[in-house]
Regions:
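Active-site bordering "gate/hinge" segments
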Residues: 1-197
């Protein structure tokens, strides 16, 4: 994923001047350049970026020594200040990837639960799966094939997609149900009752 694609994604996420944006990065230091590109892209749009890295190796060490008092309401209240979150993962998020004692794992799980509860309160929350070999392992594709496909999928005209979506939203205004036919006996029906667009 190059800088140009990252800039397009950040802009398409709605980042605007004067906002406070959390770049929540799931990855090790080896992939930190990716996080740095997201941070600089946020700043280039006139918003204030803040980086929080969730590296498995660092989290293991933190939660092996952390106490209950480390992550109280004051800590989590910091996250309610953000206008937007860019949740960027170079590998599967939340999974610690290490065995730690049950009491430490319980603290880690509570931390993650409370963190995501606060982040969900932000006005915008965008998740971005970075084309990496680690993410490819979950796709059942060869790493280079996965990376190539994902880079191509991200390298689109987001403004054109937005306009097309707005057009379709108007077209389906007032619709109660949409049915999609994708082949013989392949039908997907969506109930739109009460849906706010």
């Amino acid at each position: 994923m190059n800088k140009e694609i990252i800039s397009k994604i950040v802009k398409a996420s709605g980042v605007s001047e004067g906002e406070l944006v959390l770049v929540h990065f799931w990855g090790e230091d080896a992939d930190k350049d990716i996080a740095n590109h997201f941070v600089t892209s946020v700043a280039a749009l006139g918003a204030a970026p803040v980086l929080l890295q969730q590296a498995r190796s660092i989290n293991r060490d933190i939660f092996l020594s952390a106490k209950e008092s480390c992550f109280d309401d004051r800590y989590f209240d910091l996250f309610s200040k953000f206008d937007a979150v860019l949740d960027v993962f170079a590998y599967q998020p939340v999974v610690l990837g290490y065995s730690i004692e049950n009491e430490h794992m319980l603290l880690y799980r509570r931390y993650m639960s409370q963190l995501f509860h606060k982040l969900a309160e932000c006005r915008r929350f965008t998740q971005i799966r970075v084309p990496t070999e680690a993410n490819a392992a979950e796709s059942n594709l060869e790493p280079q094939d996965y990376i190539q496909r994902m880079n191509k999928a991200y390298n689109i005209d987001y403004e054109m997609v937005k306009k097309a979506c707005e057009h379709e939203t108007k077209r389906f205004a007032g619709a109660k149900k949409v049915t999609v036919y994708t082949g013989t006996d392949c039908v997907l029906s969506l109930d739109l009752t009460g849906r706010t667009w």
